[in-house]
Design a protein with these regions (language model features):
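Acidic-and-aromatic substrate-binding clefts and catalytic sites of carbohydrate-active enzymes
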Residues: 103-111, 130-140, 164-172, 209, ...
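Acidic (Asp/Glu)-rich catalytic clusters
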Residues: 87-89, 115-121, 140-155, 176-186, ...
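Bacterial N-terminal signal peptides
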Residues: 6-15
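H/E-rich (His + Asp/Glu) clusters that bind or coordinate divalent metals
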Residues: 260-412
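N-terminal pre-domain segments of enzymes
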Residues: 23-93
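Divalent metal-dependent hydrolysis catalytic cores, especially in the metallo-beta-lactamase
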Residues: 95-101, 114-136, 154-162, 187-194
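Histidine-centered divalent metal-coordination motifs
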Residues: 96-103, 232, 292
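Active-site gating/metal-coordination segments in enzymes
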Residues: 140-259
Length: 412
């Protein structure tokens, strides 16, 4: 059902030749059985939308379905398109999942063995756990990994940073903890969570902005240690927009209301993104990896401009396959142009979802399903990347920017 705008009648009185004349805009369309030329439906004026429960079947002619309309959850049309299908169960080249969230699988020897079994089935050579671990939690995870003959060269961990109560004395402690975590075996920073810049408060109660100068010593330390910073900023722009039927993510936001960011409670999307971009510019010697393609996979021109202006910026593809796969030509060209600065990552660890990534990246298949209905109601297309680009995406770029990753198990 589409919302339609109420046409407000504006009456103006004018005296012409001694008579009173009333002027009024065209009233809202009323449902009828016939449109222009005798066609079935309801006629509307240019610029108007169809009344609720109707759709435009011809220019300016609306009609409602004869049968009761299904809900958005129940409408699941089956495509009759017959096209080539290339199911890709394993990656063509050994991959590094730079955006791993293995969760409890790193908590025990049995769990980490199970993780390796899953990775083997997908041809994922290595997972970088981006669970914001630090201190004892990080050491415990590394102990489990290093005790496993199968996992010790297959799993690495990023170090977490706590941004709570930033204020006097915070930076010195944060840098010392980061140095200790790297010495313990962490290979970078991350995943810096989306609360950073949205809801995290400083010691004085103010919102912690992404480009706050109190944080500069931490980003400078990352440059000195030669480690990348993996940062997730905010959420898709649609999450900041009104929840109406024109919002492309209406279903997701209705299923998960905690993902909404109303402007009266949170900073605006563009405000947070401006702070992020300023952070990247302020620290040109620090390598930043923007998670989820910076939430600009739906605007590759904007992301391209960022990449051109910020040579220290890299990006990662986790959880934005729905945008990559609906613009195959533009995505193909983007991945080729910036082939040295894009990393593979999956985000949530669901082994059955990885093959969708392989299919989008490796084939030219058309019009196939995405793996989660609530993310996208549209179909995907393969972007058919050439082998040299696939190799950089899957493993070479990660090996290049993360010195702490083992080099074994990859093509020479």
């Amino acid at each position: 059902m589409r919302a339609w705008s109420v046409v407000i009648a504006v009456a103006s009185l004018a005296t012409i030749s001694g008579s009173l004349r009333s002027q009024q805009q065209t009233p809202p369309p009323q449902p009828s059985n016939r449109g222009p030329g005798g066609a079935r439906g309801t006629q509307i004026q240019p610029g108007q939308e169809c009344p609720p429960g109707m759709t435009e079947i011809r220019p300016r002619n609306c009609l409602g379905p004869e049968a009761p309309a299904p809900s958005i959850l129940d409408y699941r049309p089956k495509s009759t398109l017959i096209a080539p299908v290339h199911m890709v169960k394993t990656a063509k080249f050994p991959a590094i999942d730079y955006h791993g969230h293995p969760g409890g699988l790193l908590g025990s020897a049995q769990g980490v063995e199970s993780l390796i079994s899953y990775l083997d089935s997908l041809n994922v050579r290595m997972m970088v756990a981006a669970d914001n671990m630090s201190g004892d939690r990080l050491k415990n995870a590394l102990a489990v990994i290093n005790a496993s003959p199968k996992a010790k060269d297959r799993v690495r961990v990023l170090a977490g940073i706590s941004f709570q109560n930033v204020g006097p004395g915070w930076a010195e402690k944060a840098v010392a903890q980061l140095e200790a975590d790297i010495a313990a075996g962490a290979v970078g920073v991350g995943e810096v969570g989306k609360g950073f810049g949205l809801s995290t408060k400083k010691a004085d109660g103010s919102r912690l902005k992404l480009d706050d100068p109190d944080l500069d010593p931490v980003w400078d330390a990352a440059a000195r240690l030669n480690i990348p910073v993996f940062i997730h900023t905010a959420d898709p722009q649609e999450f900041f927009e009104p929840i109406d039927y024109s919002n492309e993510r209406w279903l997701e936001l209705s299923l998960f209301p905690e993902r909404r960011y109303p402007n009266d409670k949170f900073p605006k999307f563009e405000e947070v993104m401006a702070e992020r971009d300023n952070l990247f510019r302020k620290h040109p010697k620090t390598k930043f990896v923007a998670a989820h393609m910076g939430w600009h996979a739906n605007d590759l021109g904007r992301l391209a401009k960022m990449m051109d202006q910020m040579p220290n910026l890299y990006t990662e593809v986790g959880a934005v396959l729905y945008d990559i796969g609906r613009q195959p030509r533009a995505a193909h060209d983007f991945f080729v142009k910036y082939q040295d600065r894009i990393l593979f990552g999956k985000d949530s660890f669901q082994p059955e979802e990885y093959p969708y990534y392989w299919r989008v990246f490796e084939t030219a298949d058309e019009y196939f399903d995405y793996y989660r209905d609530y993310h996208a109601f549209w179909k995907l297309y393969g972007i058919d990347l050439p082998d040299p680009v696939l190799q950089k995406l899957y493993y070479k770029n990660a090996l290049k920017i993360v010195p702490g990753l083992p080099k074994t198990g990859f093509p020479k």
